[in-house]
Amino acid sequence: MAIILGVDPGSRITGYGLIRSEGRLLEYLDSGCIRVGEKPMAERLQTIFHSLAVLIGEYRPEEFAIEQVFMARNPDSALKLGQARGAAIVSAANSGLAVHEYSARQVKQAVVGTGGADKSQVQHMVQALLGLSRKPQADAADALAIALCHAHMNQSVLRMARTGGKVRSGRVRQP
């Protein structure tokens, strides 16, 4: 049984999602958004870092998964996104968690079945897979999808290990 914290980083809104994964059983624990608004960048990063540290302290996840950086058209946006990711990653690493990274395409493929899925499809599948009464907000749904992707990858790795096969997973950074 593992508690997984998924994070969808952003310079203004960072989504988070917590699930419990035991074999094929998935249980929703919590999700939401860390909204930092128009504060100076250093304060935004501090808020992301501390908010995730509080969640990690409260739920004690064993796994941490985050979306990889994609190249945005606007270099300034890409830099800010990278900084938000850094704050989230350091928060996890400070708690001794290994950081697992997945591309947006990997996440969509694992949750929806196609790497080209749109946000509404991701929200719908997250709602269905976790048995939620309503669709989560988009950033929280993305974070839950990242956690679900990691749970799926863990199951694939375990299955392949039992059969002696090889499997390629997301990148892993050890603290």
Swiss-Prot record:
Cite a single GO BP annotation: DNA recombination
- This protein is called Crossover junction endodeoxyribonuclease RuvC
Q: How is the cofactor bound?
A: Binds 2 Mg(2+) ion per subunit.
Q: What is its main location?
A: cytoplasm
Query: What assembly does the database describe for this protein?
Result: Homodimer which binds Holliday junction (HJ) DNA. The HJ becomes 2-fold symmetrical on binding to RuvC with unstacked arms; it has a different conformation from HJ DNA in complex with RuvA. In the full resolvosome a probable DNA-RuvA(4)-RuvB(12)-RuvC(2) complex forms which resolves the HJ.
Q: Molecular function terms in GO for this entry?
A: crossover junction DNA endonuclease activity; DNA binding; magnesium ion binding
Coiled-coil segments: none
- Where Mg(2+) 2 binds, per the record, is at 67
Record's keyword terms, sorted: Cytoplasm, DNA damage, DNA recombination, DNA repair, DNA-binding, Endonuclease, Hydrolase, Magnesium, Metal-binding, Nuclease
Which cofactors is this protein said to need? Mg(2+)
UniProt lists the family membership as follows:
Belongs to the RuvC family.
- Residue positions of the active site: 8, 67, 139
Primary role: The RuvA-RuvB-RuvC complex processes Holliday junction (HJ) DNA during genetic recombination and DNA repair. Endonuclease that resolves HJ intermediates. Cleaves cruciform DNA by making single-stranded nicks across the HJ at symmetrical positions within the homologous arms, yielding a 5'-phosphate and a 3'-hydroxyl group; requires a central core of homology in the junction. The consensus cleavage sequence is 5'-(A/T)TT(C/G)-3'. Cleavage occurs on the 3'-side of the TT dinucleotide at the point of strand exchange.
Origin species, per record, is Marinobacter nauticus (strain ATCC 700491 / DSM 11845 / VT8) (Marinobacter aquaeolei)
> Is Secreted there in the keyword field?
no
Q: So what EC number does this one have?
A: 3.1.21.10
Out of the domains of life, which is the source?
Answer: Bacteria
UniProt: Mg(2+) 1 binding residues? 8, 139
Which HAMAP family would you find in this protein's record?
RuvC (MF_00034)
GO CC, one annotated term: Holliday junction resolvase complex
- Reactions the enzyme catalyzes: Endonucleolytic cleavage at a junction such as a reciprocal single-stranded crossover between two homologous DNA duplexes (Holliday junction)
Q: Which gene encodes it?
A: ruvC
Upper taxonomic lineage: Bacteria, Pseudomonadati, Pseudomonadota, Gammaproteobacteria, Pseudomonadales
Location of this chain's protein in the cell: Cytoplasm
